[in-house]
Amino acid sequence: MIKTLRACVLASLTVLPLLTALPAHAAEMPLAEGIRALPFAAESRAGYERTKFKHWVDEDRDGCSTRAEVLIEESRTKPVVEAGCKVVSGTWFSYYDQQTITTPSALDIDHMVPLAEAWDSGASGWTAQRREAYANDLGSSRSLVAVTAKTNRSKSDQDPAEWMPPSAEAHCAYLADWVSTKFRWGLSVDMAERDALTGQAEGCGSTTIDTSAI
């Protein structure tokens, strides 16, 4: 299976096809129904170390790390990319706080479901290879997102019971991205998280999630 080619990489770089796990037509489900369908389990952080999720790698060996790939993909203008796939400028919209950013150093690449939360929710039982794939998931635009460093660090490893984006306009999209990511990777929710997701989703009308899984 072939990944969508990430755009705007330096012409001097050899660009290889990227692999994807997404089906041609992803199945959709109403957000509220998706929340109810997520597996339920208590969380445990025993044994967690961030280093158990290797990132940012150059999976396709095109010279660009996962971080660079996301910056290139999400820039709303053609990014300037220097030798070594160093992204030096572009235009990014941080949807968590509705900010437009033109300096890549002001951005973090957020794991939609943080690494620690993924560990708590089932990744503790994965192989090292699957954890690496999770931490560098370019197969879904929901998995990794460029946002202001300030909001990413405010979020840290918290779930929606503990943190939501500062912009109310972002909440429904954030919930959909969160639930879709949990579906994609077969991750569970605990009681507080499920209750928070359910309550927040009440104002999200026809918002849908992607239920494709890998």
Kindly give the residue locations of the regions a language model identified.
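N-terminal module-boundary/linker segments of secreted carbohydrate-active enzymes
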Residues: 24-61, 193-195, 206-214
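Domain-level detector of nuclease and nuclease-like folds
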Residues: 92-214
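Active-site-proximal flexible loops/turns
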Residues: 20, 69, 118-121
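Secretory targeting and sorting signals
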Residues: 1-26
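Short, motif-level signal for alpha-helix interfacial/capping segments enriched in acidic residues
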Residues: 38, 84-98
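N-terminal carbohydrate-binding/catalytic regions of secreted carbohydrate-active enzymes
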Residues: 49-88
